[in-house]
A protein has these predicted regions:
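Positively charged n-region of N-terminal signal peptides that target proteins for export
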Residues: 1-5
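Sequence-pattern detector for short linear motifs
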Residues: 6-7, 89
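Bacterial N-terminal signal peptides
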Residues: 7-16
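Catalytic-core regions of hydrolytic enzymes
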Residues: 20-149
Length: 150
């Protein structure tokens, strides 16, 4: 059953990208965290490094196989990019799709299974606001963050 769900999701995503690629499409790939913001820390890895590797590995075949898809990265090296700049990159490039890559840490010996996908749902504003506050707490490590956010 799980394989059917995954196969269906991949098929739908592939068809969507293929149709969009015919018209011209801008995909912004955001490797979450970076620089002094390590993200989750594993016993032998940092989230920022995994995210960067996944983002580059995700973008490469799109660049190679979809000539009408413009791929834009928020970062290609281990640098810190403030959240407002990531949004500016997407807006400046008129992104059709913004994908932010993040990974989780696990306790030693635990096995990872599955994935998480987050999308904005407008009818649950209070709950969404709590999630947004938690997820965007990285803003507090930005230099002069008060100048960029309300």
């Amino acid at each position: 059953m799980n394989r059917r769900i995954v196969a269906t999701i991949i098929l739908i995503f592939s068809i969507s990208v293929a149709l969009a690629a015919k018209k011209g499409f801008t995909l912004v790939i955001d490797a979450g965290h970076g620089g002094h913001d390590a993200g989750a820390l594993g016993s032998f890895s940092k989230e920022k490094n995994i995210n960067l590797n996944v983002a580059l590995a995700f973008g490469k075949p799109v660049e190679s196989n979809c000539p009408n898809v413009k791929v834009v990265y928020t970062r290609k090296t281990d640098v810190f990019v403030p959240l407002h700049q990531r949004a500016d990159i997407a807006n400046r490039n008129k992104a059709d799709l913004f994908v932010s890559i993040h990974t989780n840490a696990l306790p030693k010996g635990a096995r990872a299974v599955g994935l998480e996908t987050y999308t904005l749902v407008m009818n649950r504003a209070a709950e969404n606001f709590d999630v947004a506050k938690r997820e965007n707490s990285v803003i507090l490590v930005e230099k002069d963050y008060q100048q960029h956010y309300e």
